[in-house]
């Protein structure tokens, strides 16, 4: 399933007859729960079972041991569909904020045919997505594993513009626009992998006997 929440805010203010300011921002928070695919897909044990095999009615584990799978097809590389739903977890969590703020100076030089607008705007787009791929104790007749990884990306935008308009007469109009823009982008990737839980019932990386972690930033 998917849960998503959005929040948006904006405001403007006239500080002076020549000065104005404002900001706008949007925040998004989402969580997606899904099942594995490809070589770890739970459908592998569904397609391999005949129509006469009651996948829902026959217990997915042996009696008295919820961590030993009971499936029609061998679980040397795959998990039973119903066992996987109860013991494996695949989550995608994302948080994102994007918005900008500005300060603007406007003047007509006490005339009717001249106008100057100088505006500075600072914007940001930042989001983080964290993934959890968790295979419970008993996965593929083993002791489980977990992979925690994610991305963080932040882009900062700085923009300064000056726009000048001169209505020379009814036939002639002069417009000029100058500006400067700076963009900075930062990306980070991290991953923590753990395998072979010490004991069942706690599918957490702190319960793994083997752990590997890495991080990169650019």
Regions found by a protein language model. Give the residues of each.
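Surface-exposed beta-strand-turn/loop segments characteristic
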Residues: 1-2
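Surface-exposed loop/interface segments of Gram-negative outer-membrane beta-barrel transport/assembly proteins
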Residues: 10-98, 112-218
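Alpha-helical support elements that line or immediately flank enzyme active sites
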Residues: 99-106
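A generic beta-sheet turn/junction motif
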Residues: 107-111
């Amino acid at each position: 399933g998917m849960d998503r929440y959005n929040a948006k805010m904006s405001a403007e203010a006239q500080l002076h007859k020549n000065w104005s300011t404002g900001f706008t921002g949007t925040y998004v928070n989402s969580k997606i729960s899904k099942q594995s695919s490809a070589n770890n897909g739970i459908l592998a044990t569904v397609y391999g079972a005949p129509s006469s095999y009651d996948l829902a009615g026959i217990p997915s584990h042996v009696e008295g041991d919820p961590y030993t799978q009971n499936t029609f097809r061998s679980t040397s590389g795959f998990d039973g569909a119903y066992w996987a739903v109860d013991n494996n977890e695949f989550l995608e969590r994302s948080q994102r904020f994007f918005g900008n703020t500005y300060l603007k100076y406007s003047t007509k030089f006490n005339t009717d045919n001249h106008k100057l607008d100088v505006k500075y705007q600072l914007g940001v787009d930042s989001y983080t997505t964290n993934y959890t791929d968790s295979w419970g104790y008993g996965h593929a007749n083993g002791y489980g594993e977990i992979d925690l990884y994610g991305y963080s990306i932040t882009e900062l935008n700085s923009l300064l513009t000056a726009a000048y308009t001169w209505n020379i007469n009814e036939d002639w109009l002069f417009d000029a626009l100058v500006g400067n823009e700076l963009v900075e982008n930062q990306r980070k990737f991290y991953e923590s992998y753990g395998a072979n839980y010490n004991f069942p019932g706690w599918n957490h990386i702190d319960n793994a006997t083997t752990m590997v972690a890495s991080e990169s930033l650019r």
